[in-house]
């Protein structure tokens, strides 16, 4: 609008993680909000201010503006539209803004080449769900590749262990944050072995989080993904 947050530039993305009731599958609340936005370098080092201090002040200003200007406006717009989603935005959400720090260079200059192709052919055809991330053009430092391998590894082991006949494992990440923001499991109502009778998909997901180190660097190390053999 040219009145507030005038330092913003065109390249940006957001990610919202919603917590659901695992029994009714109804949304409970907004759990995490991630906003990555390009911006001017509107605070510069100098006059006793170091480069690191200047960057920290910029990011703190952007975080505060997202929290006090952007999110309240989004909520107000949803309320005016009578959208029930407005009720999911409380005060207890986790907020990450520009988790990797300064984001001045954006658009094609910043991301050219990080694309992909044939994402469905490379994975499960039309049989399984896909989050949209491609393997092509990306090394294993990108969760599009490494976390896809990790989720497949977990799913294969759940089936091999008899936990489910069929299972979907979904991992959600945000740039600059090592741990997944959410772990979702769907066993498609597969029968459980006697020892696991009554265990919900949500409990399986929580156990996955405790048993597996799902940080990208840990996945790379576990599977030896720095070796160019895939």
Which role fits each region the language model picked out?
Residues 117-119, 124-170, 178-186:
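C-terminal catalytic subdomain
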Residues 1-105:
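Glycine-rich, mobile lid/loop segments that gate access to catalytic sites or pores
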Residues 166, 173-230:
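Internal helix-turn-beta structural module
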Residues 57, 61-65, 69, 116, ...:
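Conserved active-site and cofactor/substrate-binding residues in soluble primary-metabolism enzymes
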């Amino acid at each position: 609008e040219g009145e507030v947050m005038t330092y913003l530039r065109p390249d940006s993305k957001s990610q919202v993680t919603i917590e659901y009731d695992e029994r009714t599958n109804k949304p409970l609340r907004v759990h995490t909000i991630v906003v990555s936005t390009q911006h001017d370098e509107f605070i510069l080092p100098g006059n006793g201010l170091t480069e690191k201090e200047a960057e920290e002040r910029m990011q703190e200003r952007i975080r505060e503006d997202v929290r006090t200007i952007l999110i309240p406006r989004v909520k107000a717009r949803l309320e005016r539209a009578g959208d029930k989603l407005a009720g999911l935005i409380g005060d207890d959400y986790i907020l990450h803004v520009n988790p990797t720090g300064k984001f001045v260079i954006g658009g094609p200059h910043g991301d050219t080449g990080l694309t992909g192709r044939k994402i469905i052919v490379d994975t499960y055809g039309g049989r399984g769900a896909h989050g949209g991330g491609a393997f092509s053009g990306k090394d294993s430092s990108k969760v599009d590749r490494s976390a896809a391998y990790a989720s497949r590894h977990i799913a294969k082991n759940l089936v091999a262990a008899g936990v489910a006949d069929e299972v979907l494992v979904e991992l959600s990440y945000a740039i600059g944050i090592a741990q997944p923001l959410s772990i979702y499991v769907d066993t498609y109502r597969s029968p459980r072995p006697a020892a696991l009778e009554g265990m919900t998909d949500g409990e399986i997901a929580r156990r996955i989080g405790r048993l597996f180190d799902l940080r990208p660097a840990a996945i790379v190390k576990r599977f030896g993904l720095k070796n160019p053999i895939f």
